[in-house]
Amino acid sequence: MFAKLQRIHFVGIGGIGMSGIAEVLLNLGYKVSGSDLKPSAVTERLESLGAKVFEGHRASNVEGAEVVVTSSAIDSRNPEVAEAHANHIPVIQRAEMLAELMRLKYGIAIAGMHGKTTTTSMVAAVLAGGELDPTVIVGGRVDAMGSNARLGKSHYLVAEADESDRSFLKLWFIHAVVTNIDREHMDTYHDMEDVERTFVEFMDRVPFYGMVVACNDNEPLRAILPRVRRRIVTYGTTEGSDFLIRCVPCDSEQLLLGFLNRFSVEYRGKSLGEFLLRVPGLHNVRNATAAIAIGVGLDIPADKIRAALAEFRGVDRRFQLKGKANDISVIDDYGHHPTEIRATLAAAKQCGFRHIHVVFQPHRYTRTRDLMDEFASSFGDADSLYLLDIYPASEQPIEGVNTEALARRITEVSGRATFYAKSFQVAAIMAATAAEPGDMILTLGAGNVSQLGPQILERLSAKKVAAE
């Protein structure tokens, strides 16, 4: 590979996409350094593995580095990037480094606008259950790994493929999974036709001996499959899917054991039997079936696939229980797009809570502007809704695009009362006041809303004490 490199430097090493690659490189024996604006649990873990992590971005941080890796969030004005250019140190995107790791491996790339992280984690679990010991790089902390990356001993590498900046077109892989396409990342893509062309190009990167595993339930994806020039295997509840899903209600014993999904799968008319999941929602059944398709393609016995999925415990910030107080569950989820919000709320409804109280933090001004009407119709399964200010994610404000405008639009479209919470403290008070025993409070968004859970739990505990 690039064995002669002495030091690889990551600008923004604490990012979820960057840290996984850095961890694998550390485990391969490379010297790794990096910088981030502030320390975190992620940077502390990397330091424990041997990385040198600098707080803040300074030109001196790249001294001695032989390559500098950046994410799409880092621009050319960054002092470390500028210093690297001035000294002719190669500056590459994280996708180029991931591509180099995948180039000499049996790569499996997981793409799609929604569900990538969970599907990547499930595919990794299936390969591990089949004793294939994969290397894994994923965009979220996986409970079973205790991290977002692991170095396996086999030639298999499972990686999440980032379409947000088209960088997934740089990757090398044998098989690809595509979960869906949607109106997302429209700051990168001109329109849906551009999205479609790019995903067709991605799927055509599969070699002639590989396969594309595609969700047949996503109509926009299904519509472009005839344009793909590679072998395609489909999955879904749609009749005619190669891997056909039949959902079955869990029985009382399975529910007591913590299972939330039960389904059977037929592969081209042949039954693979029933499967159980501990994560809720039809979207997770689809994600699991993508992993089943990969497992079957790699000749992993169905019983080993079944056992691996039954033990799958989920991913950080994907319907993650933060705690319970006064018989009220506080759950956090990364969902920040209308499609994800609808799927998460449907999963919450499946769990049988009395009422669902949602605290939503919109993510990016451009996404809020472009999908305002879609957001307005996404909260139908919520019993109460509290909106925080838009999390900018480095974007500048856009005139007329704000939480108050979104709240008005939701009320116009759905007729539901929507409350603006001007701070985390106010949101915690509102949600905790509304919730009663048997309810759930769901925090939603891709920003820092996950930090709200402890405040809500504190309010709920205080409410219980006051009631006593």
Swiss-Prot record:
Stored Gene3D superfamilies: Mur ligase, C-terminal domain (3.90.190.20), Mur-like, catalytic domain (3.40.1190.10), NAD(P)-binding Rossmann-like Domain (3.40.50.720)
InterPro entries with a match to the protein in the record: Mur-like_cat_sf, Mur_ligase_C, Mur_ligase_C_dom_sf, Mur_ligase_cen, Mur_ligase_N, MurCDEF_pg_biosynth, UDP-N-AcMur_Ala_ligase_MurC
E.C. no: 6.3.2.8
Protein source organism: Koribacter versatilis (strain Ellin345)
SUPFAM superfamilies attached to this UniProt entry: MurCD N-terminal domain (SSF51984), MurD-like peptide ligases, catalytic domain (SSF53623), MurD-like peptide ligases, peptide-binding domain (SSF53244)
One Pfam family it belongs to: Mur_ligase_M
HAMAP family: MurC
Listed name of the protein: UDP-N-acetylmuramate--L-alanine ligase
Principal location listed in the UniProt entry: cytoplasm
GO cellular component terms given for this protein: cytoplasm
Keywords recorded for this protein, A-Z: ATP-binding, Cell cycle, Cell division, Cell shape, Cell wall biogenesis/degradation, Cytoplasm, Ligase, Nucleotide-binding, Peptidoglycan synthesis
Cell compartments where the protein resides: Cytoplasm
List of residues binding ATP: 112-118
Family: Belongs to the MurCDEF family.
Pathway note: Cell wall biogenesis; peptidoglycan biosynthesis
Catalyses which reaction(s): UDP-N-acetyl-alpha-D-muramate + L-alanine + ATP = UDP-N-acetyl-alpha-D-muramoyl-L-alanine + ADP + phosphate + H(+)
Enzyme class: ligase
A biological process from GO: regulation of cell shape
Free-text function comment from the UniProt entry: Cell wall formation.
A GO term, aspect molecular function: ATP binding
